Amino acid sequence: MNRREFMIMGAAGAAMAGRNSLYAAANAGVQPRSDRGIVKRAAPPRNPRPYTGLDWSKVVKVKTTSHGHCMSQWWLEQYLKRGFGLITMSNYYPSAPWCPAAKMTENYYRLHHEHAVMVNGIRKDGPFDWNKIIEPWKHTLDPAAAAKKPAWAAKYPFVEGKKIFKPLPPGVLEAPNAEHHSFRLENGKWAGNLHICSPGSTFASGTFDAHNLSKTFSHGYHYGSGEFWGTAIDRMIEGMLYEDGGGVTINHPSWTKLDRELMLRMLDHDPRVLGIEVIEDSGYNSENYWDWALSTGRQCFGFFVPDWHVENKVFGVNVLCVQEKTVHACLKAYRDGNFYGALNGLDELAFTRIAFDGKTVVAATDKPARFEIITARGVVKEVKGNEVSWTVEKEAYWQGPGYHIFARVKAYAVDGSKEVLFSQPFMLKS
């Protein structure tokens, strides 16, 4: 399954909505925004100074990603080969956690669908017995259409199959996550290019039938969220395992050409919307989105992901910096911004220190590197070696307040490995 196919087949929402009158009729009269049933919990702002209080001499580095699909044992092995210590599979159809991995079987969510779904524009709680639901229209199912998409098809009636994964190796942690899609905008229109992950949340949305092979979409069962994006985010937050850990990520803004104002509205919606993907689908680089958001004065953490492309060297890895290796500590590292990004994540280069004391940004690596300090003004310092420091300049009168706004560190390997590291940003005026 590739993303181009995903968009063409209508799983992004807007395209299918435009050419499917039945779908439009099923959703007529839906209120654009509805926060009913959501209990909002207060949360502090996103941390303006990540890594504060970390004892780098005792830091345990846990490799993971916030957005990586994992559909079989082969996929899982790609993460394990790269040394992942935390698995947070972000699968969809439905957008539901594959956690614990030990429970997952072939056809699992066709037989064990417990979460709510939007049905004819109304949110209905589970469980859903799909064999029983589909039975009245089973004679309309098209085997030829299913044969064209074997990865997403299953013979009706559905039967639970074998386990998908072998047991995780000792010491490898796992936490819930999923990739959610098909949201409404504030005006009720579809945000076809908006995808969201929520590492640490048990929230689930949508159905197994994104390609309508079982005709559930034709009968009013929405394959994705189907709700206003803000309501869906609130549900993700409501499902967090820990109040102080995990969060929401805005996926592949460059690949989907995400509207920048929508990105800002999402960051403003709740501080647990942690940030955006920087290294994303197929190795796309979204540093332009990242620096633009940061230049508005908003803290915005950067995430580094393989998405579907686990066979590439350019992978996208989040390196969590924790004092103890537990699920809670790992998810709290996400919330606090105590992690950095790696382009490859093959241990070819690592940060050994990143800090900001309010005046000076410092960073160090385990091997020589080429460092860049990046602010709202661009690259303000470049140096080679094992460490870098940059003291915030006293602003000249012609520059005005908040001239630099933020600072982040980027480190390039100089040994030919092509590894690149990305610190989280420091907001210079918290």
PLM segments and residue spans:
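N-terminal export signals
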Residues: 5-27
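Aromatic-residue hotspot detector
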Residues: 6, 172, 366-368
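Short Asp/Glu-rich motifs
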Residues: 15, 98-99, 260
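Surface-exposed flexible segments
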Residues: 21-23, 214, 293
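Charged catalytic cores and adjacent phosphate/nucleic-acid-binding surfaces used
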Residues: 29-67, 73, 77, 189-201, ...
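A metal-dependent hydrolase metal-coordination microenvironment
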Residues: 43-245, 251, 279-290, 305-308, ...
